Amino acid sequence: MKQVCVLGNGQLGRMLRQAGEPLGIAVWPVGLDAEPAAVPFQQSVITAEIERWPETALTRELARHPAFVNRDVFPIIADRLTQKQLFDKLHLPTAPWQLLAERSEWPAVFDRLGELAIVKRRTGGYDGRGQWRLRANETEQLPAECYGECIVEQGINFSGEVSLVGARGFDGSTVFYPLTHNLHQDGILRTSVAFPQANAQQQAQAEEMLSAIMQELGYVGVMAMECFVTPQGLLINELAPRVHNSGHWTQNGASISQFELHLRAITDLPLPQPVVNNPSVMINLIGSDVNYDWLKLPLVHLHWYDKEVRPGRKVGHLNLTDSDTSRLTATLEALIPLLPPEYASGVIWAQSKFG
């Protein structure tokens, strides 16, 4: 039996474990503070559900492990500075940017990047945290410790957000899912919609870009690339060197889920192109209690993470997939009264994708 240790024991590790069971792959999600002696890592392939981690007894051991897949890639992608430098090196389109080193740079920043600046911490900061949208009269809002520790990007006037989830094997082969349409609110992914056939031009551009990135890094496994949709084409926003929230729909909407695909890649199992036959919708459950009335709707698949419910915390998701888009939109309509009021706009957005 193959064994995989996942650095991190959140919901992504949990879903990797679930995906491993049918394949006979024992997956062990482990907390960063676990005692090394209690973790069966010696004969395991090592992967991670997070981009960066503190130094602990366990992470020191794993850093030396010869089967820690992508170990040297994580630091490059975890730092937005080196991530952006990678895009520039490969001549891939991304929002104009620079390192924000000193407060005195602001006039030149706005002169170069325009009236809206997006400041992001180089490391950490996700789901809208560690980011600021600033105009010239608002720069005093930025904490002093951010200088030297943040990048600043041009604010992009985009018409939509999409992500590409793909995987690369040890032999260099790559496979991809169709582009996923994403709705973010307050920096948090709320809803995703995927179709069997994405826009051909966007799909081709996205696959070419993500292939170049994975090839350059020698990356193995699933990677996600978030992009802005603009009249000039796609602009890369950020990368995630792991399974990704916007790929959760694949659990019920594809022949191979992103979680199984990642395990296949890192354990050197066959990596065929996943088949997607039907449209899918994913709704993130954020800071909401479970409601089993959702399961009265036959298209709804509930994935509950069994985490303490707190405001702003991802605690589960709902997947819906069907060949009949009218049945999908009707089910989404029936979900609205079963969800807290703040979900309505995301559900209506998903319905709008089906015309």
UniProtKB/Swiss-Prot annotation:
EC number: 6.3.4.18
Binding site for ATP: 80, 120, 125-131, 153-156, 161, 184, 237-238
InterPro entries: ATP-grasp, ATP-grasp_carboxylate-amine, ATP_grasp_subdomain_1, PreATP-grasp_dom_sf, PurK, PurK_C, PurT/PurK_preATP-grasp, Rudment_hybrid_motif
GO terms of molecular function: 5-(carboxyamino)imidazole ribonucleotide synthase activity; ATP binding; metal ion binding; phosphoribosylaminoimidazole carboxylase activity
Domain of life, per lineage: Bacteria
GO CC terms: cytosol
Keywords: ATP-binding, Ligase, Nucleotide-binding, Purine biosynthesis
Reaction(s) the record says it catalyses: 5-amino-1-(5-phospho-beta-D-ribosyl)imidazole + hydrogencarbonate + ATP = 5-carboxyamino-1-(5-phospho-D-ribosyl)imidazole + ADP + phosphate + 2 H(+)
Biological process according to GO: 'de novo' IMP biosynthetic process
Family, as annotated: Belongs to the PurK/PurT family.
PANTHER family linked to this entry: PHOSPHORIBOSYLAMINOIMIDAZOLE CARBOXYLASE, PURINE BIOSYNTHESIS PROTEIN 6/7, PUR6/7
General function of this protein: Catalyzes the ATP-dependent conversion of 5-aminoimidazole ribonucleotide (AIR) and HCO(3)(-) to N5-carboxyaminoimidazole ribonucleotide (N5-CAIR).
Subunit structure as annotated in this protein's UniProt entry: Homodimer.
Protein name in UniProt: N5-carboxyaminoimidazole ribonucleotide synthase
Protein species of origin: Escherichia coli (strain K12)
